[in-house]
């Protein structure tokens, strides 16, 4: 930066001892010499003005003619008149020109010279002048050639650089000395060489020094007030804490000692200020005296800022202003604001203290600014410290976010996918994961189910529960806690909540005298938790403020879990893998299944496995088609209840026909509950099947009716086979099976087997008439003819039922309503349920059994079981969904018709041309192409009589064998197994279309009374024909298919009006 020339520059005159020379007007030569000199040119001669001018003539060539320099004040003048006027009024004191561009306070001229005198008189500068002795010999030490420019800093004279030393040693052989100072632009002083070096003492600078010291003392007092504020706050915390540890006491002692040190520093500052005030009154005060009056800093501890070693090191911003941040950083971590209750500067007068600091001059504002920043940070800690992690510097906005973060320290993942077993830390992650499973995509109901289960399972994952016994359950929350001595502190809640919520609290280990013995399921040597009210004090240094985690909160539990993660387990209900503490041993056992993947509870319908029985119960509701219980209708004769009015009507007709005794059966004490189910395996042995407890909230028969084995070898039988001796009982059981679901075929087949067992065990001369009728019905159920579609596969074993003449049939009009609703299982070797059962409303049918009955007999070893090849029935949810293409249908019949498109099944065959159709409606339309009249009853009768062997077109070659060997021979004392060889014949179309009207008009076959020990005997040439809705009638036929004459003694049908009433179809 270029320096501008001063208007009136002055030369520094180093001669002070010379007296005043007589003023003489300069000669022309002198004027020329003075004019030849540049402004600010040095005066090389220490003599008078004449000598100087003479010596300077040969040195410099004159440039200007009108330059005049005063010998006293070294002022330069360019006009002679001005110079002469100045000579008259000139004094020895040289003027000082200070050019300052800053706005700070500028010290006076006297203080500037006094400061220069101090610097020159400092002992560190060996070549400086002594203040009291400014002789010519002293001047020679610096060199008479030297010209010193005193540059004062433009900023505030508060930093150590403001009063700095001049360069040491002699100045080089030059007449100009420049000193670069920071923060200055232009500041030049010129003094005469003969001017005295600070002839006046530096008493004028003492008030400024005292002012700075007072500012420093004010800062110290503010620090003392702040530390006192901290001490009061800590005392308030200590008053709230019930138990203060040793560390807390040490912290308080350290804080008190620090406050006392601050007080001592303040006292030292006050003493120093008083000493300086006394010495300031002495005008002959030197720098050495000031040095002797410096503050003693050797006794100041390192916690406080050490004072400077000299007066010049006193600044407006000493290290003492950083006492508060340093002090806060030196405090133990327990005293820092980790919780909202431990926030500094919270009292109302702290803000007043900081506001008072703003009244200082100059640099004291920095203290208020830094304290304000600290106050803002402290207020931020109030907001953020509430959810601050104690183990890492992360801060969260909500408590739930902090809980999720704490799981990263514990490694806990409480949310488990029930399908694949993957674990997650948050419920949202589990939800997203569940939506990716194809099982959940197919059935969205499972998502809500799994989420509910996940919420319940994750509710007590972090709890460290303490079991409360029954005798202490009456304790209130306000009861005095019992302190536990001799145990490590875990920072637990101060009071333990009794009652059911006690499992959510945490407990530590108890003394040995309070610990019961280890449980057999826990590890050896691991004591159980004691009982009773337990109180554990918080950790030393931890303060419970207004924002601290509540007792028993999840955040506190997670924090304790992090602290105790490396400790050995002492709880018998604690998981050794993830260290989670469960409420009881059963919960712990279920929890271990999440680690091992064990799922012992398996659904017998779909084969899915679950880890708990409750989950299995919830899952069974998916398979339950209808859960509501409809209004039941009671039979007026035997008081049996039915949900379907049509079934009740048929039941009453059975009473009137003599098939069911009119006397009501004795009530069984196990109404609405099924006996122990029986599972029949391939080897014929019967075994009990486990069923759920009644306390689990599910009816036993409701569960057992849905039990389907995972394989085809075992089938559950809800009612023992001996119970089926009564027709009403068997009817009720089958109705109950149907109301629970449409797939109870195995029980129906078991009923047939049990009926054959009874017939074979009750008498050796019994014929297979009843069994043949069952087999015929069984095979006709498997046939694909239109008649077999509506065949009722039901034949109870009873004396009344053995009467082959008690037959009831339905009209073709009844088939119209029933054909579409016939239920089949679309698998290999399919079977079907009777449509009457399918139309029955869901109910819990009361099973009525006699007072005494025999147990289920074992199956003969020589009889091949029919259940070995039975496929597992398909159970659908409430919506009827196709398992192959995924289409949904409103009813099971529509789904059944749709499934025929996949299998290619065409069960309805034309009796004239043999063409097959998938639906009965298509077959009916096809009949019209043969030219038959529209009267379906007439058409059916003509087809059945005129072309009785049309249905045997496919396998007609077996018809003579069937009629010759079996149908035309007496059916007495024939092994039931021998009837199985004709299964294929019956499937091929042996069941012919017999018109119901003709049967009713011709009359039925008379029933022959038989005893309980023998089965019924069917006359030669009779074949049991089962209709779609009732047990079929026996038509006497000859070997060539002609209809035989009915004897006169045979009774007619008991219900001639059955056709008209049966037209009512209830879906």
Curated annotation (Swiss-Prot):
Chain residue numbers at which the record places covalent cross-link Glycyl lysine isopeptide (Lys-Gly) (interchain with G-Cter in SUMO1): 151, 317, 379, 846
Domain of life of the source: Eukaryota
Bias type Polar residues, positions: 119-137, 707-716, 752-761, 798-809
Keyword Repeat: yes
Cross-referenced PANTHER family: SAL-LIKE PROTEIN (PTHR23233), SAL-LIKE PROTEIN 4 (PTHR23233:SF19)
Quaternary structure and partners: Interacts with POU5F1/OCT4. Interacts with NANOG. Interacts with BEND3. Interacts with NSD2 (via PHD-type zinc fingers 1, 2 and 3). Interacts with NRBP1.
Mapped zinc finger ranges (C2H2-type): 68-90, 387-409, 415-437, 573-595, 601-623, 633-655, 880-902, 908-930
UniProt keyword Magnesium present: no
Descriptive protein name: Sal-like protein 4
Subcellular location: Cytoplasm; Nucleus
Function field: Transcription factor with a key role in the maintenance and self-renewal of embryonic and hematopoietic stem cells.
Residue ranges, compositional bias (Acidic residues): 693-704
Bias type Basic and acidic residues, positions: 810-829
Keywords from the named record: Cytoplasm, DNA-binding, Isopeptide bond, Metal-binding, Nucleus, Oncogene, Phosphoprotein, Repeat, Transcription, Transcription regulation, Ubl conjugation, Zinc, Zinc-finger
Cross-link (Glycyl lysine isopeptide (Lys-Gly) (interchain with G-Cter in SUMO2)) at residue(s): 151, 170, 185, 291, 317, 377, 379, 441, 557, 604, 630, 846, 906, 942, 957
């Amino acid at each position: 930066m270029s320096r501008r020339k001063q208007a009136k520059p002055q030369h520094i005159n180093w001669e002070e001892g010379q007296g005043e020379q007589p003023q003489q007007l300069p000669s022309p030569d002198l004027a020329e010499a003075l004019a030849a000199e540049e402004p600010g040119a040095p005066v090389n001669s220490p003599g008078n003005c004449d000598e100087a001018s003479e010596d300077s003539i040969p040195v410099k060539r004159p440039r200007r003619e009108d330059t005049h320099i005063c010998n006293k004040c070294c002022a330069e003048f360019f006009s002679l008149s001005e110079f002469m006027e100045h000579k008259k009024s000139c004094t020895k004191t040289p003027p000082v020109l200070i050019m300052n561009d800053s706005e700070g306070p500028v010290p006076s001229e006297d203080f500037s010279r006094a400061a220069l005198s101090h610097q020159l008189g400092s002992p560190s500068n060996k070549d400086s002048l002594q203040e009291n002795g400014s002789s010519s010999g002293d001047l020679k030490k610096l060199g008479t050639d030297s010209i010193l420019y005193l540059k004062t800093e433009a900023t505030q004279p508060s930093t150590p650089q403001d009063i700095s030393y001049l360069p040491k040693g002699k100045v080089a052989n030059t007449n100009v000395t420049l000193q670069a100072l920071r923060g200055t632009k232009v500041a030049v002083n010129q003094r005469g060489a003969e001017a005295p070096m600070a002839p006046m003492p530096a008493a004028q600078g003492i008030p400024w020094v005292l002012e700075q010291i007072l500012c420093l003392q004010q800062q110290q007092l503010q620090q003392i007030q702040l530390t006192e504020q901290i001490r009061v706050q800590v005392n308030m915390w200590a008053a709230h804490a019930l138990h203060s540890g040793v560390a807390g006491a040490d912290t308080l002692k350290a804080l008190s000692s620090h406050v006392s040190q601050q007080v001592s520093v303040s006292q030292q500052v006050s003493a120093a200020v008083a000493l300086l005030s006394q010495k300031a009154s002495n005008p002959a005060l030197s720098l050495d005296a000031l040095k002797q009056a410096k503050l003693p800093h050797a006794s100041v501890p390192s916690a406080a800022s050490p004072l400077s070693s000299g007066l010049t090191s006193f600044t407006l911003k000493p290290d003492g202003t950083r006492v508060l941040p340093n002090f806060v950083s030196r405090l133990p971590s327990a005293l820092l604001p980790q919780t909202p209750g431990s926030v500094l500067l919270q009292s109302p007068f702290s803000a007043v203290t900081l506001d008072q600091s703003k009244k200082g001059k100059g640099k004291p504002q920095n203290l208020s600014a830094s304290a304000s920043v600290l106050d803002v940070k402290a207020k931020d800690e109030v907001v953020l410290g509430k959810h601050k992690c104690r183990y890492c510097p992360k801060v969260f906005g909500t408590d739930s976010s902090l809980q999720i973060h704490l799981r990263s320290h514990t490694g806990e993942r409480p949310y488990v996918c029930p399908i694949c077993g993957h674990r997650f830390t948050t419920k949202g992650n589990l939800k997203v994961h569940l939506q990716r499973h194809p099982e959940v995509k197919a059935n969205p109901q499972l998502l809500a189910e799994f989420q509910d289960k996940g919420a319940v399972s994750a509710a007590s994952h972090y709890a460290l529960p303490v079991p409360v016994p029954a005798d202490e359950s009456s304790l209130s929350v306000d009861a005095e806690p019992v302190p536990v001595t001799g145990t490590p502190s875990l920072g637990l809640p101060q009071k333990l909540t009794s009652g059911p919520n006690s499992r959510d609290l945490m407990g530590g280990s108890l003394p040995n005298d309070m610990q019961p013995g280890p449980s057999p399921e826990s590890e050896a040597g691991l004591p159980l938790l004691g009982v009773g009210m337990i109180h554990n004090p918080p950790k030393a240094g931890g303060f419970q403020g207004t924002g601290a985690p509540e007792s028993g909160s999840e955040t506190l539990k997670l924090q304790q879990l992090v602290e105790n993660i490396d400790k050995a387990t002492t709880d018998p209900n604690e998981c050794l893998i993830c260290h989670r503490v469960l409420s009881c041993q059963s919960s712990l056992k279920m929890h271990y299944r999440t680690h091992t993947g064990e799922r012992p509870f398996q659904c017998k319908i779909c084969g899915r496995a679950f880890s708990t029985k409750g989950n299995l119960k919830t899952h069974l509701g998916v398979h339950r088609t209808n859960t509501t219980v409809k209004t039941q209708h009671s039979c007026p004769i035997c008081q049996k209840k039915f949900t379907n009015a049509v079934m009740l009507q048929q039941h009453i007709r059975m009473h009137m026909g003599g098939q069911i005794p009119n006397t009501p059966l004795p009530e069984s004490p196990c109404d609405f509950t099924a006996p122990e189910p029986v599972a029949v395996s391939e080897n014929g042995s019967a075994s009990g099947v486990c069923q759920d407890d009644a306390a689990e909230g599910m009816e036993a028969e409701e569960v057992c009716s849905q039990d389907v084995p995972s394989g085809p070898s075992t089938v559950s039988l809800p009612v023992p086979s001996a119970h089926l001796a009564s027709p009403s009982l068997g009817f009720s059981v089958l109705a109950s099976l149907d109301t629970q679901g449409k797939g109870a075929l195995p029980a129906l087949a078991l009923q047939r087997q049990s009926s054959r067992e009874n017939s074979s065990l009750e008498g050796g001369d019994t014929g297979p008439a009843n069994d043949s009728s069952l087999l015929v019905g069984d095979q006709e159920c498997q046939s694909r003819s239109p008649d077999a579609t509506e065949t009722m596969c039901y034949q109870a074993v009873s004396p009344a039922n053995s009467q082959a003449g008690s037959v009831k049939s339905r009209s073709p009009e009844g088939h119209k309503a029933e054909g579409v609703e016939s239920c089949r299982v679309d698998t290999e070797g399919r079977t079907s349920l009777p449509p009457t059962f399918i139309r029955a409303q869901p109910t819990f049918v009361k099973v009525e059994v006699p007072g005494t009955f025999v147990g289920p007999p074992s199956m003969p070893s020589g009889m091949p079981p029919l259940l070995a090849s039975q496929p597992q029935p398909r159970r659908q949810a409430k919506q009827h969904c196709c398992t192959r293409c995924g289409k949904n249908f409103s009813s099971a019949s529509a789904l059944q018709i749709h499934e025929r498109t996949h299998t290619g099944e065409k069960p309805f065959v034309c009796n004239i041309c043999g063409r097959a159709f998938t639906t009965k409606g298509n077959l009916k339309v096809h009949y019209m192409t043969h030219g038959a009249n529209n009267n379906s009853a007439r058409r059916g009768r003509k087809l059945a009589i005129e072309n009785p062997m049309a249905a045997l077109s496919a396998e007609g070659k077996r018809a003579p064998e069937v009629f010759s060997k079996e149908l035309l021979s007496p059916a007495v004392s024939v092994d039931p197994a021998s009837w199985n060889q004709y299964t294929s014949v019956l499937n091929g179309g042996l069941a012919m279309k017999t018109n119901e009207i003709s049967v009713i008009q011709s009359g039925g076959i008379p029933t022959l009374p038989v005893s309980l020990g023998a089965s019924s005997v069917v006359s030669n040439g009779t074949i049991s024909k089962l209709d779609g809705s009732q047990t079929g009638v026996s038509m006497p036929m000859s070997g060539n298919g002609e209809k035989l004459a009915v004897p006169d003694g045979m009774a007619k049908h008991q219900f001639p009006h059955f056709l008209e009433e049966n037209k009512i179809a209830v879906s």
